[in-house]
């Protein structure tokens, strides 16, 4: 079944970031997710508070490297800064490395990757693809790797607690995808393929999970009432 941008998923199978998705990923996400690039800009602006000379920044689930690459371009004039993307899909890292040859991309799951002491760790629409029973362990690992004064930025799609509001947001999301060229069949196919793969939480559930992992200072930034950025120090 087709989900748009020449991405085809076999009937009855779940969504995967492998199997040729990397070649079409950039176009697909920009046409699928409202304010995708604006979210990158917001993360980069926030990074100014944490990236200094000799800093280390990770992006978890770095895909084709656009966000970690943009962050690096913003701070590359600083002394010996390091920006590392962690992505378990080899094809994604191949695309990322071809665009940003000066950066390091590690092909590994976050669970298996070794995190060095770091000033900033970014998760941009990544944690929602991790099974819920594994998230606390990953968040604890992130917390333990941050240096004093460091930060974790979590950018996630969340479920609204009010069913009426949730319905409005879902409806607007579908309209956004239609306006960007996706057919109703492609939208439905993508939605069905994501069942059991992308598992979203409410805002309260995410905050509680983060606090359980050790984060004590949790703040939220709302982006035009569409995206939620959870900002942790």
Identify the residue ranges that each predicted region occupies.
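Conserved alpha-helix/loop element of class I SAM-dependent methyltransferases that forms part
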Residues: 37-53
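N-terminal, positively charged/glycine-rich alpha-helical extensions of SAM-dependent methyltransferases
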Residues: 1-24
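C-terminal alpha-helical "lid/dimerization" subdomain adjacent to the S-adenosyl-L-methionine
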Residues: 158-209
């Amino acid at each position: 079944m087709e989900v748009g941008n020449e991405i085809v998923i076999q009937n009855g199978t779940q969504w995967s970031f492998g199997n040729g998705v990397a070649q079409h990923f950039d176009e697909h996400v920009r046409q699928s997710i409202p304010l995708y690039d604006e979210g990158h800009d917001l993360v980069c602006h926030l990074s100014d508070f944490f990236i200094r000379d000799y800093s280390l920044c990770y992006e978890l689930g770095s895909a084709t490297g656009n966000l970690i690459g943009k962050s690096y371009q913003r701070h590359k004039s600083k002394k010996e800064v390091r920006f590392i993307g962690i992505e378990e899909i080899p094809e994604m890292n191949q695309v990322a490395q071809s665009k940003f040859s000066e950066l390091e991309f590690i092909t590994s799951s976050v669970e298996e990757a070794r995190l060095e002491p770091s000033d900033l760790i970014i998760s941009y629409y990544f944690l929602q693809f991790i099974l819920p029973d594994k998230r606390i362990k990953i968040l604890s690992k992130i917390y333990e790797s941050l240096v004093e004064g460091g930060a974790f930025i979590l950018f996630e799609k969340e479920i609204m607690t009010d069913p009426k509001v949730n319905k409005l947001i879902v409806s607007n999301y579908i309209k956004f995808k239609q306006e960007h060229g996706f057919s109703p069949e492609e939208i439905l196919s993508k939605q069905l393929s994501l069942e059991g793969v992308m598992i979203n939480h409410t805002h309260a559930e995410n905050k509680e999970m983060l606090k359980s992992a050790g984060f004590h200072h949790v703040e939220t930034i709302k982006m035009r009432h569409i995206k939620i950025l959870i900002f942790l120090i």
